[in-house]
Amino acid sequence: MLKEKKDKEKNIYMIPKILKSSKSKSILKKPKWLKIKLPSNLKKINKIKKILKKNFLHSVCEEANCPNLPECFNNGTATFMILGSICTRKCPFCAVTKGRAQKIDKNEPKKILDIVIKLKLTYVVLTSVARDDLKDGGAKHFSKCIYEIRKKKNIKVEILVPDFRGKEKIALKIFNKFPPDIFNHNIENVPRLYSLIRPGADYIKSLNLLYQFKKICPNIPTKSGLMLGLGEKKKEIISVLKDLKSVGVSIVTIGQYLQPSKNHLLVQKYITPKEFKNFEYIALSLGFSKVFCGPLVRSSYHADRQYLSF
């Protein structure tokens, strides 16, 4: 069991001792290929941060401490995190704040559309915290955002959704009426490590969510992502890729897990660029339409390019 550490500001949760830094377990040194060069001009980055803050909106880029934030913000792109900034789950790999969920901002869909227009975006990615407190898991709010954004023509919408634990049927019924252009749900890692990495989630149910969406919306691409470096084995990764292919997933992303803070899971291994290239080859050989592999690859990193190349 994960023991909650009382910290009202950061809402940090204690993780198992075997995965925390200690004298017996040294922290792996970050390799050179993971070093990021900050852009010289921070004007666009600060502009997006200011706009989001002013409208009380959130980006997963900021909330999850994404390493690609400087590049994405500098290119004028961001992944909107809807339904608040506090997650009802306690996944020990994730930097997003955990705790009691916030009240839904009913004006959020319109606020997002305003920003989309202001930033002249043509591709929008929506994601959310897990909302186990809601009867539909937050699916209706996703659909409202999709509906609002599509008031502006020629904008593609990708959604990266939680697993809607116990509310999958309700959520899928809603998405059938208001489908996105790409449906994304991250499998994250291998089933053997699920109880450690995704407590409260279920590997088979995540696969089934992807399968059921594809069943009701066969013409809409489905997508999923993995993060490596948490102790998984190569054969397990290949097995997960085969499972994803079997449920109709056509786009897959594979990146390196990076420890957000000392209070999160330790990195067990840094995967080399060569190894990522090998996984890309394996995934393509399994029949995926598009595969994006690399140390800094994230589910919504260059999502617009992923869609355009589909």
Curated annotation (Swiss-Prot):
Cofactor (UniProt)? [4Fe-4S] cluster
PROSITE patterns for the chain:
RADICAL_SAM
What Gene3D superfamilies does the database record attribute to this sequence?
A: Aldolase class I
Query: Top-level EC class, please?
Result: transferase
Pathway listed for it is: Protein modification; protein lipoylation via endogenous pathway; protein N(6)-(lipoyl)lysine from octanoyl-[acyl-carrier-protein]: step 2/2
What's the EC number here? 2.8.1.8
Q: Where does [4Fe-4S] cluster 1 bind?
A: 61, 66, 72, 300
The UniProt entry, under SMART domains, shows: Elp3
| InterPro entries assigned to the protein according to its UniProt record, in alphabetical order | Aldolase_TIM, Elp3/MiaA/NifB-like_rSAM, LIAS_N, Lipoyl_synth, rSAM
Textual note on the cofactor: Binds 2 [4Fe-4S] clusters per subunit. One cluster is coordinated with 3 cysteines and an exchangeable S-adenosyl-L-methionine.
Chief subcellular location equals cytoplasm
Localization annotation? Cytoplasm
Which keywords does the record carry?
Answer: 4Fe-4S, Cytoplasm, Iron, Iron-sulfur, Metal-binding, S-adenosyl-L-methionine, Transferase
Is Lipid metabolism set as a keyword in this record?
no
GO cellular component terms, alphabetically, are:
cytoplasm
From the record, give the transmembrane residue ranges.
none
The Radical SAM core domain, residue ranges: 73-289
Question: Which residues of this UniProt protein bind [4Fe-4S] cluster 2?
Answer: 87, 91, 94
What reaction does this catalyse? [[Fe-S] cluster scaffold protein carrying a second [4Fe-4S](2+) cluster] + N(6)-octanoyl-L-lysyl-[protein] + 2 oxidized [2Fe-2S]-[ferredoxin] + 2 S-adenosyl-L-methionine + 4 H(+) = [[Fe-S] cluster scaffold protein] + N(6)-[(R)-dihydrolipoyl]-L-lysyl-[protein] + 4 Fe(3+) + 2 hydrogen sulfide + 2 5'-deoxyadenosine + 2 L-methionine + 2 reduced [2Fe-2S]-[ferredoxin]
Pfam families, sorted: LIAS_N (PF16881), Radical_SAM (PF04055)
The Swiss-Prot or TrEMBL record annotates one GO molecular function as: metal ion binding
Q: Which NCBIfam families match?
A: lipA, PRK05481.1, PRK12928.1
Indicate the family of this protein: Belongs to the radical SAM superfamily. Lipoyl synthase family.
Q: What is this protein called?
A: Lipoyl synthase
Specify the species. Answer: Buchnera aphidicola subsp. Cinara cedri (strain Cc)
Give the organism's phylogenetic lineage: Bacteria, Pseudomonadati, Pseudomonadota, Gammaproteobacteria, Enterobacterales
